């Protein structure tokens, strides 16, 4: 797994590597400048430092800090090292050493990042060098604590496509065949008065009035009532999402909620029961009763079957990822790799999430039963399960644009707390709300793409760039906790969408082996034998680990596709030229244009 150490270590994100190859993303390409800059990006300061590289030792360099990134360029002739770190990636900045520190390179800054790497810089003790760099980094990495805007609100990039137009909720519901005689679209939440963390348009049973919805909302955590996420195109079974019922220790009941779930059940005439998947371990669901929550009991919900999926909470997932980071950065212990990976429990959690989503998809497709999914508040594990199940069931979501719509719909519009889970611009790195829930979802998607290499239009780079900009604060896509907050901040007017960047250069993110198959259901194998650590993401910063290179067959196939496209373009140009000649009035019976055959392409 390990390869020989190299003296040239480039710690770039995938996106920053693309900056050097293309100007489509709007980066300043002036090679006389020391640091690449986006429109709206300004240089704040620069300073000579010693970068304590965990792989090659101390390297003298100059660090540049802008209002968007930390950029380090090596000053040593035998090193081509460049570090390019968006400030949004930084989780914590700590001072290293004190005034009495005498060890070599023992005085400086330690920087912890959200993307599985740490940085250490040694600075001179005189001239307040460390203090100045610490204060500037803290100010721009954590702008919310200093009444400064996130960089997304300063970014002036322009693209030839508008990513904000990718998702239109009503159009997406119409694609699914909604509304119909069982389901209607309501705008009761237009002003976010019913539920401030739900989107404005909701799909609910046709027989449920808006007054019914208001009464049901009083019995669901955060007023997150059961609403439709997806409907099967043939058997018309549905996936419905919500939060936990407010049962409490006394076992409270709510006739309106019970009746509402019955109405949902009755939209499906094939099965007499509604299947409820509670994402939590049963012991946690019982414990939630102490804080007013709970689950649907058999006594209250006679026509429902309840299953617990044993997926752990945000705190367990956060600690698990910390353990992954400990074993992959900076060094990988080859001799204890398997036991170390097992001790993180990360792949066990991936397995449980995938297993739960498979159960949801199978129950809807093969079991012909409508399904209701919830966890506690319905914005973490619930989003994982519904979106993964929809990805398995609906081939549309496996296209580039379809996946963007899936993320916009099930995660962004339905209130996954991105600001709280990621901590955009927030210095409180110990916040208990931080958790890698969305990363876990993307990891599950990657696991599926490994098992079904022709089923997804997008490639691995597509997934990695989404994760890179989950943290970067360059785009407005993942900012804030819910749709109502984004509307208040006018995010779609004042920021650029990540989908603008991706969709303006789609070829870069396409899987050359993609085969479009409509209505094919994917059932990944969620066993530990078939799951693996995503090396190209989690261990990409370590130059000693041999990254998984593109398959030579894949590379050749992409070259042939490019060649085919070039030939098609040239043939089309010939056809246009030929058509123009044929439309000209003949100059003589033996005009060459009359004798030229019409060129056709058989591609």
Curated annotation (Swiss-Prot):
Q: What is known of its domains?
A: The GRAM domain mediates binding to PI(3,5)P2 and, with lower affinity, to other phosphoinositides.
Phosphoserine: residues carrying this PTM? 13, 18, 588
Write out the ranges of the annotated region (Disordered).
1-25, 579-603
The record's SUPFAM superfamilies line, in alphabetical order, gives: (Phosphotyrosine protein) phosphatases II (SSF52799), PH domain-like (SSF50729)
Membrane topology of the entry = Peripheral membrane protein
| Myotubularin phosphatase domain mapped to chain residues | 163-538
Summarize where a 1,2-diacyl-sn-glycero-3-phospho-(1D-myo-inositol-3,5-bisphosphate) binds, as residue positions.
Answer: 288, 313-314, 376-381, 417, 421
Tell me where in or outside the cell this protein is found: Cytoplasm; Cell membrane; Cell projection, Filopodium; Cell projection, Ruffle
Which reaction(s) does its UniProt entry say it catalyses? a 1,2-diacyl-sn-glycero-3-phospho-(1D-myo-inositol-3-phosphate) + H2O = a 1,2-diacyl-sn-glycero-3-phospho-(1D-myo-inositol) + phosphate; a 1,2-diacyl-sn-glycero-3-phospho-(1D-myo-inositol-3,5-bisphosphate) + H2O = a 1,2-diacyl-sn-glycero-3-phospho-(1D-myo-inositol-5-phosphate) + phosphate; 1,2-dioctanoyl-sn-glycero-3-phospho-(1-D-myo-inositol-3-phosphate) + H2O = 1,2-dioctanoyl-sn-glycero-3-phospho-(1D-myo-inositol) + phosphate; 1,2-dioctanoyl-sn-glycero-3-phospho-(1D-myo-inositol-3,5-bisphosphate) + H2O = 1,2-dioctanoyl-sn-glycero-3-phospho-(1D-myo-inositol-5-phosphate) + phosphate
Q: Where is it found, in Gene Ontology cellular component terms?
A: cytoplasm; filopodium; late endosome; plasma membrane; ruffle; sarcomere
PANTHER family per the UniProt record, alphabetical: MYOTUBULARIN, MYOTUBULARIN-RELATED
Q: What is the lineage of its organism?
A: Eukaryota, Metazoa, Chordata, Craniata, Vertebrata
EC class of this enzyme? hydrolase
In this chain, composition skew of type Basic and acidic residues spans: 14-25
Q: Name one GO molecular function term.
A: phosphoprotein phosphatase activity
The reply on keyword Hydrolase is yes
Where do the GRAM domain residues begin and end?
Answer: 29-97
Residue positions annotated to bind a 1,2-diacyl-sn-glycero-3-phospho-(1D-myo-inositol-3-phosphate) are 288, 313-314, 376-381, 421
Q: What protein is this chain from?
A: Myotubularin
Subunit structure, briefly?
A: Heterodimer with MTMR12. Interacts with KMT2A/MLL1 (via SET domain). Interacts with DES in skeletal muscle but not in cardiac muscle. Interacts with SPEG.
